[in-house]
Amino acid sequence: MKSKSSLLKSGLLLSLLTLVSRVLGLAREVVKSTLMGTSATADAFTVAFMIPNLFRRLFAENAISVAFIPVFTQHYSMPSSAQVPCSSKTKEFLSAIFTLMSSVTASISLIGILGAPYIVRLFDTDQSLTVSLTRLMFPYLWMISLAAFFQGMLHSIKVFVPSGCTPIFFNVSVIFSMYFLNVSHMNVAIAAAIGVLIGGCAQALFQLIFVYMHGFRFTLQSPLKAMHDEGVRRIIALLLPTTVGIATYLLNDLVCTALATSVEIGVAASVQYSLRIQELLLGIFIVSLSSVVLPDLSFHVMRKDWQSFEDLLITAIKIVMLITIPATFFVLFSSDRIITLVYKNAIFNELSVRMTATIFRWHSVGMLAIALNRVLISAFYAQHNSFAPMIAGTISFVTNIILATLLFIPLGGKGIAFSLSAASMVQTVFLWMFLKRSWQITIPSLYKTSLYYGVKITLFSVIALVPTWASSFFTAYFFPGSHKIISHGVPLCVEALIFSCTGCILLLLSRDEFAYKALRSIRFCR
């Protein structure tokens, strides 16, 4: 059983790799904005990459997080090393999953390639270019689904480093492809699509090495035989309810992207640029935390150790609040500086900055809800309950579609961004409500602890903004340079430092448990 400090240690290790990956992901978007801006080409690539990426979330992330890890952890023996490989029962199970996942994703990729002209008609983009890009990138679905399968095996035995490295390979592949293939006068969107394929292949092959090193074995078998595997039937039973929820999620993204492309040129790309920075902020800790916490929650469920389950869940929720609430306030204060510093260039002009910064502010409002949803959904999945997240996700989808349809004409891109944030909050509310039905957890204590901590961090964030706001007048006076590094980068760093230091002092004065653990760790390192 992992202690709180062990959870933090595992989370920080994966967070370090995720930080590198997210920074490179942001660098990828910066290169994209430099070469494409908010042009029709950028919109075409955004749409074309979104289509296989949505199916990836269904067949890769959904299957692994909802069903594979809980079933694998609780019902199958793990290999001890390459010399002592997994049991025959485990090998049969892994072979069945490998066969079905390969067959399904390869078939969908083929259908997507053939049906691309009909799919892209939903979007108001350059049809010819979007079709070519969609066809080129659909095989990425097959590659990344296998990578997710390998990741699930490694996470089940608490091996997180390889899967933390693979997104780095992906981002580097896309960046290098855009730069070097563009030099040879290839269309930059086509170059980026080739990078996507290279990156997906690298993600799968790199993890496969570690899978075999840790003793996992599997082969292709008859799909009919695979369907009759006991573990596969368990996974299908868990996946069926979420298929509806994920289908609504896919439709949700499709509708919002279609609305964005119909507003004006560049809105779809601006939404993507905004989401990339949001993913950087969330991904550094939150994605890593949810990846680390799921196997441990599943372990506590298997042992019926509900007190440890509740303690771990409360710890995860507090960490989420500690990170996302201050980040939200700082983003609302500094969104213009952030977008200017990251994206502004000759092609990504002042109009693009204003459009993206406004969308970014509305996206940031939903960061806490999105982060909480990741942790709360893991709590349901660990209990083999995929029905409650499905219902909450469906309600969120309906909310998003209604709001986006009503707001995209009068408000444009910011209306679409607000709709996503509001829908995420609605999903959080319903997940809390459904969690109340879990009799094993002391819900009043969980609510009270979470609410108190959230209010405390919100208050501290507001207080920390006061000296940050005051310092902005001095930074504007002392750093008026025309170069964005001087006029925006230096002030942003100064303001972030003041905001962070003020917040840390307030946490230490309030004897916050996480602040004291961090302080003890620093003293120990010295």
From Swiss-Prot:
Keywords: Cell inner membrane, Cell membrane, Cell shape, Cell wall biogenesis/degradation, Membrane, Peptidoglycan synthesis, Transmembrane, Transmembrane helix, Transport. Pfam families: MurJ (PF03023). It is found in: Cell inner membrane. Its main location: membrane. InterPro entries: Lipid_II_flippase_MurJ/MviN (IPR051050), MurJ (IPR004268). The chain crosses the membrane at residues 35-55, 58-78, 96-116, 137-157, 160-180, 190-210, 235-255, 281-301, 313-333, 362-382, 391-411, 415-435, 459-479, 489-509. One of its GO terms (molecular function) is lipid-linked peptidoglycan transporter activity. The keyword Transmembrane applies. It comes from the Bacteria. It is a multi-pass membrane protein. One of its GO terms (biological process) is regulation of cell shape. Pathway: Cell wall biogenesis; peptidoglycan biosynthesis. GO terms for cellular component: plasma membrane. The keyword Cell wall biogenesis/degradation applies. Belongs to the MurJ/MviN family. Involved in peptidoglycan biosynthesis. Transports lipid-linked peptidoglycan precursors from the inner to the outer leaflet of the cytoplasmic membrane. HAMAP family: MurJ_MviN. This is Probable lipid II flippase MurJ.
